[in-house]
Amino acid sequence: MKFVTASYNVGYPAYGAKFLNNDTLLVAGGGGEGNNGIPNKLTVLRVDPTKDTEKEQFHILSEFALEDNDDSPTAIDASKGIILVGCNENSTKITQGKGNKHLRKFKYDKVNDQLEFLTSVDFDASTNADDYTKLVYISREGTVAAIASSKVPAIMRIIDPSDLTEKFEIETRGEVKDLHFSTDGKVVAYITGSSLEVISTVTGSCIARKTDFDKNWSLSKINFIADDTVLIAASLKKGKGIVLTKISIKSGNTSVLRSKQVTNRFKGITSMDVDMKGELAVLASNDNSIALVKLKDLSMSKIFKQAHSFAITEVTISPDSTYVASVSAANTIHIIKLPLNYANYTSMKQKISKFFTNFILIVLLSYILQFSYKHNLHSMLFNYAKDNFLTKRDTISSPYVVDEDLHQTTLFGNHGTKTSVPSVDSIKVHGVHETSSVNGTEVLCTESNIINTGGAEFEITNATFREIDDA
């Protein structure tokens, strides 16, 4: 299985990346306020690491320069040609209370491969230049968006990306580590370091919450892998290790579907993305490596060590799961071309391992069966089950005796009739004297009848039959 990789120096520290389509990548970053010649930019590139030259591997389609005196972009997302960028204006303007249009909207024209600025807005009205837009996300269909501030506790806003109007404001319980939309955009989930909260984007109300995570986990990233299932990545507070956990939020209840420590090589992760099918996750580690995880069994499938020379700020997967892109504060873009249908691919090593595992299980089962037959264990087991389970089952008391009724036969002359008596512990009849005639036979009923139905025994005493002359 072959991976093709390529790297490119974009010329500025990159803090955000997002695929606009299967091979078109948007990158944002810059030197920030007082950038010393390092621009603040948005760059659109067509990527293909299989090409021969760097220019073909990373073909710049469009660039948009931001104000030199403004801060560098801190967060971006895009959907259906709409791009939202979190980027503060210059600090002097902010501290003077002149506003800070920290959320900016762009449009990408895929026909002309051009970026166009549309509008910007100030939601926070902050005079603290250290406050910035930490997270920006748009739903897959582009119908709803969410932003979160760097404040603690953070303010999260659900907005309409079409006109940048606010729908809801959510006061969180602490620092928002990450957030993400369900595939249909009806639900947004966010995490703090120790909790998960799920919010309806229709009503703004909380529909699910989980706070009982492992105390040794520090939650860091979240992504929906289905409309009712989220994937959360956490680092271990004590020692190295990354844990992935799948959590169902169906019907407003949270339940852990599976958790697994996928590696003990990393101390933390800086970014995570999941493909559109919910089959593959890509993680960026604190040691500047890229890791691929197959979500069907939460197995670590590939690690690209030291993909960048400095901190990885974001990873993203193309819509068709062909490319994985990562960007870094080291001014670099790194592209990995994945093998076809990689998430479901089984390597030769895995096939051999599975074969030998199955072979050993078959041999072991055959040995057990042979041993059982040789020592007649199957008959012993059957007899044991018969004596201890089947017999007991047949004698379990019920409203009626076996065959549902206890049958008593009473003879009248040469004929017989059968009557049914419900089962009780005992039926006792005393002093009954009744004479009746049946076909010329007089019957005197018993002086004392005792029917012990517990043991299905009958005692009939003093039964007298007298012949009656036909007159």
From Swiss-Prot:
Localization: Endoplasmic reticulum membrane; Golgi apparatus, cis-Golgi network membrane
Main localization category: endoplasmic reticulum
Intervals, Cytoplasmic compartment: 1-354
Keyword Transmembrane: yes
Alphabetized Gene3D superfamilies for the sequence: YVTN repeat-like/Quinoprotein amine dehydrogenase
Positions in the Lumenal compartment: 374-471
Family membership: Belongs to the WD repeat SEC12 family.
Name used for this protein in its record: Guanine nucleotide-exchange factor SEC12
The species this protein was found in: Saccharomyces cerevisiae (strain ATCC 204508 / S288c)
Biological classification of the source: Eukaryota, Fungi, Dikarya, Ascomycota, Saccharomycotina
